[in-house]
């Protein structure tokens, strides 16, 4: 544990070093794929409105929270406090669980699309499912490495 602490691996980056450290580099990809999920769900038709509502909530919530955390890390609002490492790990674990549930529900709703939907609408939903699973993977990887950082802090 001492080498990680000595090299700064157990603290959060600030400034533009956020874009050069792993797992914080994943913020960019979470932002991109989360935005794509948000756009695709907003423009697609889902046979079960409750599912679309949950997927929209998850994508908008995670998009906004990821953006807020990214901006706060860039401006250095954490000040090197260990509580921010805990917040980072907790947020990414919750976001990973939320996105996993949203991805599964969106996939289930897309599979259930049969009659009354065009080929284009079906493909929009398939794209939303794929990007949702990519976002889930990104959040899971970020959560795992955030938990490792939290444990070493």
From Swiss-Prot:
A cellular component term, taken from the record's GO annotations: membrane
Pfam families, sorted: MARVEL
Domain MARVEL: 18-151
Alphabetical UniProt keywords: Lipoprotein, Membrane, Transmembrane, Transmembrane helix
Membrane side Extracellular: residue ranges: 47-53, 115-125
Bilayer topology term: Multi-pass membrane protein
Modification comment: Lipoprotein.
UniProt keyword Translocase present: no
Record bears the keyword Transmembrane: yes
Compartments, record wording: Membrane
Gene Ontology molecular function: structural constituent of myelin sheath
InterPro entries recorded: MAL (IPR013295), Marvel (IPR008253), MARVEL-CKLF_proteins (IPR050578)
Bilayer-spanning residue ranges: 25-46, 54-75, 93-114, 126-147
Ranges per topology, Cytoplasmic: 1-24, 76-92, 148-153
GO biological process: myelination
Function: Could be an important component in vesicular trafficking cycling between the Golgi complex and the apical plasma membrane. Could be involved in myelin biogenesis and/or myelin function.
Family: Belongs to the MAL family.
Protein name per its UniProtKB record: Myelin and lymphocyte protein
Species whose genome carries this gene: Canis lupus familiaris (Dog)
């Amino acid at each position: 544990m001492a080498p990680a602490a000595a090299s700064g691996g157990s603290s959060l980056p600030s400034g533009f070093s956020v874009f050069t450290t792993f797992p914080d580099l994943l913020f960019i990809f979470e932002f991109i794929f989360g935005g794509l999920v948000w756009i695709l769900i907003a423009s697609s038709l889902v046979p079960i409105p409750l599912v679309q509502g949950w997927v929209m909530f998850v994508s908008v919530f995670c998009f906004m929270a990821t953006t807020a955390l990214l901006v706060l890390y860039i401006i250095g609002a954490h000040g090197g406090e260990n509580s921010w490492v805990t917040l980072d790990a907790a947020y990414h674990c919750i976001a990973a669980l939320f996105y996993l549930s949203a991805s599964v529900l969106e996939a289930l709703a897309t599979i259930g699309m049969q009659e009354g939907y065009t080929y284009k609408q079906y493909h929009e939903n398939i794209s939303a499912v794929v990007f949702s699973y990519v976002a889930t993977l990104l959040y899971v990887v970020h959560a795992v490495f955030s938990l490792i950082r939290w444990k070493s802090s």
